[in-house]
Amino acid sequence: GKIAGMVGWQTGGLPAALTEDEMNTKFYIRGITSFQTGANVDPLILLDGVESSKLDLARIAPEDIETFSVMKDASATAMYGARGANGVILVTTKKGQEGSVYATARYETVFSMPTKRIDVVDPVDYMKMYNRALLTRDPLATPKYSVERINRTRSGKYPSWVYPANDWYKILFKNYNVNHHAGLNIRGGSKVIQYYASVNYNRDQGMLKTDKLNDFDCNITNNQTAFRVNLTIDLKAGIKLLINSSTTIDKYHGPLTSVNQAYELAFNASPVDFAPLYPGDENYGWPHLRFGTTEANQENPYMMIQKGYLERTRYSTTNRAEYIHNLSGLVKGLELRGSVAVSQAGYYTTGFTTNPFKYSLLNYDFETGKHRLQDLSPFGASYALSIDPTAKASTTETRVTYEARALHTAAWKEHQTSLTGVF
């Protein structure tokens, strides 16, 4: 929907982004024209009164949201100090209600596909244009691709790994993926305790292909589970206790190589110099992935995706208790509030990699159809998985927030006053 005064967009398309850099979402409430480049223009996000990140905001189930408000004028944001200078987003989740138990369940299946695909030049034109570029710089240069090779590639009569014509995008990516969402929430309560509880599960998948010879899946899969419990407890007349607790757990499985890098390789790797994979010959016929290359340190896009995988876990939990005491019996319109919130977030990642086997096509016998491969594999090449020390990391952050608030409202005749003090 539309929210007056707020501009937001997301330029990252990674399924199940676990960091704000991967999500790459921006919110602007008060504009950025007066800020210098690189200045912090992010608004303050308060989720049930607790400062939260854009990542936490993105993980709230829509059915859990009660209100979503935007504050941008100076008087409204004054109580938040300098942190509210860029505007404030206030989100409150649903609370319990007195009455019988009311439960709702929801399940969704979503098919996703790219909105746009970039068309690239076909392999034959690529070779012609490459030769033309060489001759433009040096008229005496020898063309890299012979007329015979260009004609044989065009004919399509020979095995695709002898005269490759790779569409790397089709080789790496599927046409679509399937995502799932399930949610359950319960609401109800008595005069003393009202409750709202929900559990939501999301399964998001990417569109990367996995080779059948691999013992592991290279595609992105993220399983996200979120729990939320909100309690309102009437201790006695004029005194309430609010308890909000939420936890989100993400379990991510994906390729060792970033999807952004894979996408970049798909449009920059040569479509004709080597095949994604070569079939076995007399010397290297045992079952394994024989990645094509022309030199030892050349990057094969298919190899970069299939060589390993990454396991990532992110959790975030927020627990808040608020004490509300209505003192209207002492001073009409006076209310005191005190709250404490504890938030913790953790991120863990472990990478597993193989040492891929690399080969180039040494020769091909057009009469017998036999071929020979040249082994360009690095020392210690193996399809056995091992932990990648460069892809192992963990971080944990804990934050405790206290707040004391006094509110006084009064009205006489046609006038109203409101006074708020916050610490």
Residue ranges and their predicted role:
Residues 200-224, 254-256, 261, 312-318, ...:
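Small-side-chain secondary-structure face that scaffolds active or pore-lining regions
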Residues 72:
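Flexible N-lobe loop architecture of eukaryotic-like protein kinase catalytic domains
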Residues 1-44, 50, 57, 62-63, ...:
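Membrane-proximal, glycine/serine-rich, low-complexity loop/turn segments characteristic
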